[in-house]
Amino acid sequence: MSAVAAGSGARLDESVVAAADAVQEAMRRDLLQLAGQQAAVVGAAPAGAGKSHFVASTVGLLRASGLRVALAAPTNDQVQSLVQRVKELNPDLPVAFVHGQGRDLPGHLASLTGVTQPSAADAQRQQDPLVIATIDKLADAFLRNGLGDFDVLVIDEAYQADAARYYTAAGVAPTHLLVGDTGQLDPFSPLDDATYWRGGPEDPLQTAVGVLLRNHPGTPVHQIPVTWRLDPRAVPVARCFYPGHSFSAAVLPEARELRLMRPGPGSQVLAPIDAALDEAAASGWAHLTLPGAPVLRADPATAVFIRELAHRL
């Protein structure tokens, strides 16, 4: 079975796009007004809201305003993607990527003009660069050495960051911008004793945003009301994972199309998979239930089924 997607130049719902732009401008306005104060701004987004684009453009605006900015995310892959996105939108902006000592700058970043890999101390002495690092590296490299003279700390994927990491890095700047997908799974730990703290007022596995809002309930929270990734047929399902957050698809109904073409007859095993794919192509989503059975935490049968579904698609 092969797939053909139509509608790459999809028509947009201009009212939805305008509403999202207005929310993002309000976030930037709040952030600039609060810069330098002990304050924060939160941006809550559904999947596919363009939050990384918003973050990259916003740090460019902050630097253009003369503010020293530290940009962080939980994982190495995320911060490397942020470096690329920042350079795409701000090609002339110097970027200091603070990585592990003795590790070379990844090839796809080394080829970017204006991206350096200084030590934390060197990055601190430089006046121009935007500093980008993981939350852990930012806390270790700067606060351990008494550094961290930034005006604004920006954290992308903030709902994936746990409170413990946020506590360690929060001191690098007085003003924070936390942006993330509220539908993500909460932070977790593989340690058996991690549940000792669960439910406590200072649970280290709370989200960074959760602990911020509990301690500072007056923090402005802006909900980005758009998803560029989903079309209108899938949005009602996605909204179930975002209670209290209203958002709509940026593309108009029927602006996208998925046509599936079968190479030949399927089998009894493939029949439910084909039916689910046909339903998803027609309706924008599908729900497929496996036969009930007692399973372990790791369910190999489900993993095999997902693999077969992806292979068939």
What is each PLM-predicted segment?
Residues M1-A40, G264-T289:
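Short, compositionally biased "basic patch" segments
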Residues S2-L32, A44-A49, R68-A73, D77-V152, ...:
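Conserved P-loop NTPase motor core of helicases/translocases
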Residues A40, A44-A49, L61-L67, A73-S81, ...:
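Conserved helicase motor core of SF1/SF2 NTP-dependent helicases
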Residues F54, T58:
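Hydrophobic positions on the alpha1 helix immediately C-terminal to the Walker A/P-loop
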